[in-house]
UniProtKB/Swiss-Prot annotation:
Location in or out of the cell: Golgi apparatus membrane; Endoplasmic reticulum membrane
TM helices/strands, residue ranges: 16-36, 69-89, 109-129, 143-163, 180-200, 208-228
Protein name: Post-GPI attachment to proteins factor 2
Protein topology in the membrane: Multi-pass membrane protein
Alphabetical keyword list: Endoplasmic reticulum, Golgi apparatus, GPI-anchor biosynthesis, Membrane, Transmembrane, Transmembrane helix
Family of this protein: Belongs to the PGAP2 family.
Taxonomic source organism: Caenorhabditis elegans
InterPro entries xref list: Frag1/DRAM/Sfk1, PGAP2
GO annotation, cellular component aspect: endoplasmic reticulum membrane; Golgi membrane
GO biological process: GPI anchor biosynthetic process
Main subcellular location: Golgi
Primary role: Involved in the lipid remodeling steps of GPI-anchor maturation. Required for stable expression of GPI-anchored proteins at the cell surface.
Length: 263
């Protein structure tokens, strides 16, 4: 891509997707492996002492060192790009050439709501990362509930908006992105309710192996959430986020105001 006179920085959008997908998935994988290798007995223990072979996400990422530091660093690093992408996706939807000709105020409100939910999801994720269940179980549980609710509503709303604004049919990759969004959202919602059931069943009946299944469902929920957000690769395929001066006189926009295609 050629730089204009007022362009300060240009970053291919695919690197943002690598960051928002690669950092949290790597953090989860590393922390689970380390907890199994270094703290197997502690990380897999349960309150009723039944057989369990996998740590829950909370046990794997927020209880022992060095796992909790790896998790906090990698999640913290990926939050910044997530915030930028949340606003960029909102502008992407509103800028669709195939958006409806009527109901502009309603559409803008829903796009703003989706963006707000996405930002709030990241806030709750950051709070979950900073406050472990062992430090403040009540607050940690509330943050998890907020994260899950915001995630589900955002996934469903943004997928609907992607179709409603015409982005699904605007490019050849739009249909693929839409299908992957539906897949990621469906798996996340399924994992949420299945995880709640397994958690209840474990605490009620204390059956061997149930908490292991719960942990697997937790991992699947996290990975499906990451997968959903990585569909942005298709939405912004071949594009760059450009930092540019407002008037060519040294006043700079801190958020992406121009998304150009590679030339």
């Amino acid at each position: 891509m050629a730089f204009g006179d007022d362009d300060i920085l240009s970053i291919p959008f695919k690197y943002f997707v690598i960051c928002i997908g690669g950092l949290p998935s790597s953090a989860l994988l590393i922390c689970v492996i380390l907890s199994l290798l270094l703290h197997f007995d502690q990380a897999t223990s349960t309150h009723c002492e039944v057989a369990n072979w996998l740590p829950s996400i909370s046990a794997a990422v927020s209880t022992y060192t060095p796992e909790k530091y790896i998790w906090r660093i990698l999640i913290g690093l990926h939050i910044g790009p997530r915030l930028v992408v949340a606003i960029a996706f909102r502008n992407f939807l509103l800028g669709s050439p195939l958006r409806p000709l009527t109901g502009h105020k309603r559409l803008r409100f829903l796009c703003n709501l989706a963006c707000f939910l996405n930002l709030l999801e990241n806030f709750f994720l950051l709070a979950l990362t900073s406050i472990s269940s062992s430090e403040d179980h009540s607050l940690h549980a509330k943050c998890f509930g907020g994260f899950a609710i915001c995630s589900i509503i955002y996934m469903l709303l943004s997928t609907w908006l992607f179709n409603e604004t015409g982005r699904r049919t605007a490019t050849n990759l739009g249909q693929r992105s839409h299908e992957y969004k539906i897949l990621g959202a469906a798996i996340f919602v399924l994992c949420f309710f299945l995880g709640a059931y397994l958690y209840w069943r474990h605490n009620t009946y204390c059956e061997p192996g149930i908490y292991t299944l719960f942990a697997l469902v937790e991992y699947s929920a996290v990975l499906s959430n990451i997968f959903f957000h990585c569909t942005l690769y298709y939405d912004f395929h071949g594009k760059n986020i450009v930092l540019t001066s407002s008037f060519g006189g040294g006043h700079y926009n801190l958020l992406p105001t121009q998304i150009d295609k590679d030339t």
